[in-house]
Amino acid sequence: MYEVIRRLVDDGEWFDLKTQFAKTIITCLARMGGRAVGIVASQPRQLGGILDNDSADKAARFVNLCDAFGIPLLFLQDVPGFMVGTKVEQAGIIRHGAKMLYAVSRATVPKVTVVLRKAYGAGYYVMCGKAYEPDLIVAWPSAEISVMVRRAPSTSSSADRSRRPRTPRPSERSSSMASARSSTPTSPPGTL
């Protein structure tokens, strides 16, 4: 992602903020066409660029900083979504993600979003996705934007599926139930 930033900004120079904190997201100030710009970019080389509690906080603070000083925002997306699991849920991933969501939604500066490779689920949404109505949103021709990650079935789930008994189709169920009813002996009325 740093190579992309280097090619976009004037003289290939930028000022990174909080480089040692929440490494799955990059927040930096740079110049593009001589004008100051704030860049929020996912870092796919760190945990695939997934958003967690710290990265959501880092991005929210940076967006608020840029908005306070009237610095336009550029979002570079290569994000698989938010971290999931009991540990992050107990640490408040919803609360931290909401901070980022609120910061991006209330920012009044111009916003541009570029989807470079992948943008899935809530990660796409909070990184200034279409719902925020950015001033410009573009995607690389091979980029994937989706609610869920598209995955091939794993071999273990395929093997499990082959061992399970096949569930009959609705048409098969109704015919088998009808034949079961006709072969069941009936008792005279009033008896068990």
Model feature map: region roles:
Residues 1-192:
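Ligand-binding clefts of soluble mixed alpha/beta catalytic domains
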